[in-house]
Amino acid sequence: MNRRTGVKAAALAAAGALLLSACSTSTTGSDAGGDGSALTVGTTDKVVALDPAGAYDNGSSLVEQQIYPFILAYKPGTAELNPSIAESADFTEPTKYEVKLKDGLKYANGNDLTSSDVKFSFDRQLKIQDPNGPSSLLGGLASVETPDDTTVVFNLKRENDQTWPGVLASAAGPIVDEDVFSPDALTPDQEIVDAEAFSGPYTIDSFKFNELITYKAYPDYQGYVEPAKTDSVQMRYYSDANNMKLDVQKGTIDVAWRSLSATDIEDLGKDENLTVHKGPGGEIRYIVYNMDTMPFGAKTDDPDEKKALAVRQAMADSIDRQAIASQVYKDTYTPLYSFVPDGLPGANEALKSAYGDGQGGADVEKAKKALEDAGVQTPVDLNLQYNPDHYGPSSGDEYALIKDQLDKTGLFNVNLQSTEWVQYSEDRTSDVYPMYQLGWFPDYSDADNYLVPFFYDTDETPSFLANHFRDDQINKELTDQASTADKAEREKELGTIQDQLSEQLPTLPLLQGNQIAVSGKDVKGVEETLDPAFQFRLALLSK
């Protein structure tokens, strides 16, 4: 015990003194489950899959947060992590992170939840490595041991991994029922629902894929988030944000949560029966380049790395982010000039000085020179894909303006196309789109989460982008920063990585935005869940 205590203290000091102890709030049996009036929440976010191994998107993550147990959870209103189904969670050695589970954990189907389920959950993520899944977050995990039914030891590749507690509360962290889920393939949605493989604040009572989910409070929930204040919550999925706007105005739904247009938000803010809630911003929007299929990409008929880079650089020189933020989003978004959003430790504005006029604006002559110096004939044909439903109704206007900005330079001829989200998710990882829109909502509040999933790429841990960008030096630096205990030194390392990425431009960051929800005046709890953890907790809502 003395050895354990001493090592734990040293490790936690190195990890920023994150203290995770059994003093967290927990709930059991008869205390759980609210009796508030039923609520209906609307969203345009689509669900890709209920299986956590096959989904790494905002719509699917929202569902996971309601129905699955996590080892750690964020305290509402903060980015502070606490044990959830764990009694405790700490480093016992620099590369060993030990979790003690609470006794008597069960899934809604009656199956015991033990350390075996925890090991199973992480092992299957790494084995399946679905291109739409979050396995890229587990690049720092070497193996999982289970000394007994309530003890889990995570063997980590990096000493004092600064990010591991956040990973446990992320999209890679749901603990699934090993008696229901396949160990080496995705489990179909309906099988999960029929088997009642849930142990979060809610279970799923009924399920119609991307139409309607009815949640029911789980009475035996033992996680950190308080018992659900409302016994029954419906999540209604919209293909058209205008219909969602009309429904929240009429009171057909109680909350509209992602994504309304900036014009709609402005309009709804004038309705005396509604409240517009705003929370901390962590969302980013960006263009992804497929290094194989973009103009002059590695697998095109005319591969040329120098020319491909020049095309990316010239696009960066030609985009006016402020115009997009103001004209399309009425400044509910702000320009993003790096790969990490402003406000996080380590963020810089590497792209602002490197491209365009050096002040954030476009510079067509600079773009023209970049292409000329590389021997690129103009105009360059660009096939640019965007998604009209997942990232909000203004995506069409956003990408129409991007097309207009690029076309007006005379250097590009943009062919703009759109695809709905479920198909889009499959296509983008199958080399269908040479360049395309994506957005990002963080798994945890750290610059690492805007870098590692995108740009750390190995055979064992492919990147989430699947865009064929791989740089061994950046891989090494991403690994090193995660275990750098000195805050100032780590921020310096993060800045260096962003500078290097700005030279290669595997993606083109565009905007960052706030969390916004609209609710009826009688709805409580919305403000509490719009917090730096970026998790929308239905359990906090009531009316």
PLM segments and residue spans:
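Detector for C-terminal structural segments
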Residues: G34, K208, L212, A217, ...
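N-terminal lobe/hinge region of extracytoplasmic solute-binding protein
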Residues: G42-E93, D123, A197
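Aromatic- and charge-enriched surface segment that lines or borders ligand/interaction sites
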Residues: S88-P131, P147, V153-N155, D247, ...
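Surface-exposed binding/hinge segments that line
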Residues: D90, S135-F181, S206
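Alpha-helical secondary-structure segments
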Residues: T114-S121, T151-N155, G200-P201, T230-S232, ...
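Gly/Pro-rich hinge or "lid" segments in bacterial periplasmic/extracellular proteins
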Residues: S170-V225, S232
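Ligand-site clamp/hinge motif
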Residues: D220-D267
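Structural transition elements
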Residues: T334-D373, H390-S395
